[in-house]
Amino acid sequence: MDSDASELFSDCGSDDRDSSTSEPCSSDDLSFTPAAAAGIHRLLLSCAAEASDGPISSLVAELESPKASVGSLRRAAMELRLLAKHNPDGRIRIGASGAVRPLVSLLSHADPLVQEHGVTALLNLSICDENKAIMVEAGAIRPLVRALKSAASPAARENAACALLRLSQLDSTAAAAVGHAGAIPLLVSLLETGGARGKKDAATALYTLCSGARENRLRAVEAGAVRPLLDLMSDPESGMVDKAAYLLHSLVGSAEGRSATVKEGGISVLVEMVEVGTSRQKEIAILSLLQICDDNAVYRTMVAREGAIPPLVALSQPNASPKLKTKKYTYGRYD
């Protein structure tokens, strides 16, 4: 992943919160009575102490109890969720305590709030790299995909998308497993129909998945990702132009992605971005056009008809960026 893309996709849908101390996707919109808030505060203080495994173990035991009521499951999952949100050391202890498997089991619970607390607790745990492997080994991927598809609340679905993003960052095998489990069509749907937060989360997750496993690019194209990406690129008010452009560039690395982009009218969108976009947008649009033109005379003719030759000629200028100079060498036919 190049440095521009790393910066652009470094978050999971949050522009105003530090992911080391807060949930990186949907905000924690819970409200508590004074008594409940005081209890949570005592829990956080006790778990921050040196010998803090006792409270965590009690919460895990509560989740695992076959006699646990819905209320007790809500409370235990919520407290683990908040501890993982606020306490970096607590994330490691929770992951090592055996909490992941019972939290995963909550994703199929009938109660929407139990499910949401479970999803968000897993999301907060996944901030810690050590917990990613634990979650994958615990079989969290498929339940998270099911939550992304059918969780009762939008927050749970968006947080499931973010958790899948975190797991896909573990390695290429995990990224392929997330794609194989059926996450990509659901993320494309979230990209099309979600709110502003959901769209950003979906784009970030898709970019990571498509960068981490080549087969995921084909899955994204087959799921219809190109059309909503072009729509977002054409809408400055979306706040998604850069993210969508970088994700599209990832997809046009495949023949299927290039074909879908041309079929959906993407050449004109890219040419317009070259003409009126920011410097970063111009650069990624030119790189995508060059990728589309590579070894395809028909596409080169279409690009020329859209008026893209002048900006491509600019590749030969001394002030061209290093990336574009590299592509100039690769696609020297445009000199």
Name each region found by the language model.
Residues 143, 165-168:
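Hydrophobic, ordered structural segments
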Residues 1-85, 90-93:
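N-terminal "cap/leader" segments of large eukaryotic alpha-helical scaffolds
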Residues 55-58, 98-102, 139-140, 173, ...:
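Structural recognition of alpha-solenoid helical scaffolds
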Residues 68-80, 111-124, 134-138, 152-166, ...:
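Alpha-helical solenoid repeats of the armadillo/HEAT superfamily
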Residues 92, 133, 146, 173-176, ...:
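Recurring C-terminal helix/loop segment of individual leucine-rich repeat
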Residues 94-146:
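Eukaryotic helix-linker segments that join adjacent hydrophobic helices
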Residues 59-60, 102-104, 143-146, 186-188, ...:
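Buried hydrophobic core positions in alpha-solenoid tandem helical repeats
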